[in-house]
């Protein structure tokens, strides 16, 4: 980083800019005198909007350009929604800080119906996520699930135009954009298990940039970091790309981590679930062991079909 100036690489969507400003404000509050600049960028994920994410490379499309900016020293940190962060990082880069988690649940959004259970058979539901799709299809095979891309505002416009009867978004994104009133129902994890890291903001930087890492340390939230560590360890062992039918959610309850996970066929015809409880110090180990249980119980075949494009949808 330059003397007392820290540069944040960010996408230009309203939610990405909210996250970047959130980190900027937190850094300036912790380090008075620090100047923080935003470096807005357009990623491939922002440009390719007419194709489902699973077919164009997954959510890593939202991250790559930001990482190139870090490697070329055009920025010092990149701020990500943790559910968009791929399993692996380019050499020399890494995730060094995880901020306090917002509500991780999925949101049911509709202008006509108050809940998922109220949707009549044949209703059209929009989501861009195979994870949400497989859980919806299992619970309500009578619904029509259609792909829905674009930023939050675009997705809400498509709902308001009557293209969908309901859409599923993240509670955290709607709250951060001041759109909490659009949430008709927050879906509990038993109904829609969240994505790995959902609701958490992560910060990536060059691993050899000691000064930046020292500045970021004050923003790390240990409880969130533990929970996300367990979720990401499971996802890493599953070799889960960013656009796969994998859900994972860890809670800290009474000094124990409770980790739940699932892998589902996109059409909801198969769902492999599992859970673990254990000591926070074993967060990573628990994630790996739960992933291995899922793989042995049928997740390996489901994921192979998804990656090969053979999965029923």
From Swiss-Prot:
Q: Which reaction does it catalyse?
A: 4 porphobilinogen + H2O = hydroxymethylbilane + 4 NH4(+)
Report one GO cellular component: cytoplasm
Q: What class of enzyme is it?
A: transferase
Q: Which InterPro entries match?
A: HemC, Porphobilin_deaminase_cofac_BS, Porphobilin_deaminase_N, Porphobilinogen_deaminase_C, Porphobilinogen_deaminase_C_sf
Task: Look up the domain of life of the source.
Answer: Bacteria
The pathway this protein participates in, as annotated, is:
Porphyrin-containing compound metabolism; protoporphyrin-IX biosynthesis; coproporphyrinogen-III from 5-aminolevulinate: step 2/4
Keyword Transferase (UniProt): yes
Give the note describing cofactor binding and stoichiometry.
Answer: Binds 1 dipyrromethane group covalently.
Enzyme Commission identifier(s): 2.5.1.61
Q: Which cofactor(s) are needed, names only?
A: dipyrromethane
The molecular function terms of the Gene Ontology recorded here are:
hydroxymethylbilane synthase activity
Keywords (alphabetical) are: Porphyrin biosynthesis, Transferase
| Residues modified as S-(dipyrrolylmethanemethyl)cysteine | 242
One Pfam family it belongs to: Porphobil_deamC
The answer on whether this UniProt entry bears the keyword Ribosomal protein reads no
State the family it belongs to: Belongs to the HMBS family.
Free-text function comment from the UniProt entry: Tetrapolymerization of the monopyrrole PBG into the hydroxymethylbilane pre-uroporphyrinogen in several discrete steps.
Q: Which PANTHER family match?
A: PORPHOBILINOGEN DEAMINASE (PTHR11557:SF0)
What's the subunit arrangement here?
Monomer.
NCBIfam families listed in its UniProt record? hemC
Add the further remark from the entry: The porphobilinogen subunits are added to the dipyrromethane group.
Q: Which HAMAP family match?
A: Porphobil_deam
Q: What is this protein called?
A: Porphobilinogen deaminase
Q: Which organism is it from?
A: Escherichia fergusonii (strain ATCC 35469 / DSM 13698 / CCUG 18766 / IAM 14443 / JCM 21226 / LMG 7866 / NBRC 102419 / NCTC 12128 / CDC 0568-73)
Gene from which this protein is expressed: hemC
